[in-house]
């Protein structure tokens, strides 16, 4: 889409500006992701004690948790870099997860884990497309509107 840049003040006046709408649903799914990641940490500690701190799969779980934080922190703050940073962190986490399968202890490597990873890859596609194409995300974080938006022809652009 050909986006038209608007000023931050114009963006704030736009009806789609703000942390609202489908952005809440996307946020909720990411919070669920954090909960499932923490559940993974609990599973590793329960099954292997605290020794897994030296196990790559344990570190990967914590890294995955850290990679989800930029979106969760930056989205409500309306940080301009949120879409780019969040997409990059998300796909780095997926790549690490996919690359870590060989390091996971046998009991943790099961169909449940594979199903979760498949879900999160599919969600990653939705997450990425939403952050790239959403009108709300573009207005709020990137201060730009679509070509048919009334603000695209504002006096500030002339």
Predicted regions and their residues:
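Topology signature of small-to-medium multi-pass alpha-helical membrane proteins
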Residues: 1-158
């Amino acid at each position: 889409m050909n986006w038209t840049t608007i000023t931050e003040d114009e963006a704030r006046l736009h009806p789609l500006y703000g942390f609202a709408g489908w952005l809440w649903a996307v946020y909720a799914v990411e919070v669920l992701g954090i909960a499932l990641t923490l559940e993974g940490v609990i599973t590793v500690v329960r099954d292997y004690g605290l020794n897994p701190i030296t196990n790559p799969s344990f570190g990967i779980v914590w890294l995955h948790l850290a990679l989800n934080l930029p979106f969760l922190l930056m989205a409500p703050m309306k940080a301009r870099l949120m879409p780019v940073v969040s997409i990059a962190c998300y796909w780095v986490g997926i790549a690490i997860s996919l690359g870590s399968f060989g390091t996971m202890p046998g009991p943790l490597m099961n169909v449940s884990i594979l199903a979760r990873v498949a879900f999160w890859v599919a969600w990653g596609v939705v997450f990425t497309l939403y952050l790239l194409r959403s009108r709300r995300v573009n207005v709020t974080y990137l201060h730009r509107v679509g070509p048919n938006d009334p603000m695209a022809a504002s006096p500030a652009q002339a």
